[in-house]
Amino acid sequence: MKNKLNGIQNYMKNNGIYEVQMLDKFEDNSIKFIEGIDLSTAYSFEITFKKVAYIHCLMSLYEPEFRLATEEEDNEIRKNYGAYPGKTVFIFDVDKDTEYYNKYFVIAEDLDYKTELVFR
C-alpha cells in the first residue's frame, strides 16, 4: 500500500500535478480522483479508491499529499466514524504548509492509480 502511495506522490510531483478532481460518479463502491488539461473530454491521471466505506473530503483537492493514517489518526477516525474492519484509512493532507491546511480522509479497502489517457 505504501508503495502505491509513494508512486502516486512521485508521479504527481514529477509531472507537475497540483490539483485533482473527484469524478461525480460513484460506481462499484469506488471513487476516482482525476487530473488532465480538459476534464470534459479526457484525463491522464486517475486514482481509484476501491470498496469505499466512508469519505470525508472536497470534490477538488489542491496540492494533496496522499498517505496512510497514523495509528493515532486511525483510532480517532474509526472511533468517530465507524470501525469498518478490513478497510484502510487514507489521509489527504491539503495545502499542508499553509494557513489553509486541511486533512481529509477516505476509508476504503484498496487503492490503485493509472497514468494513461482516458477519453470520457
Regions found by a protein language model. Give the residues of each.
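Surface-exposed, interaction-prone regions used to assemble/regulate multi-protein complexes
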Residues: 1-120
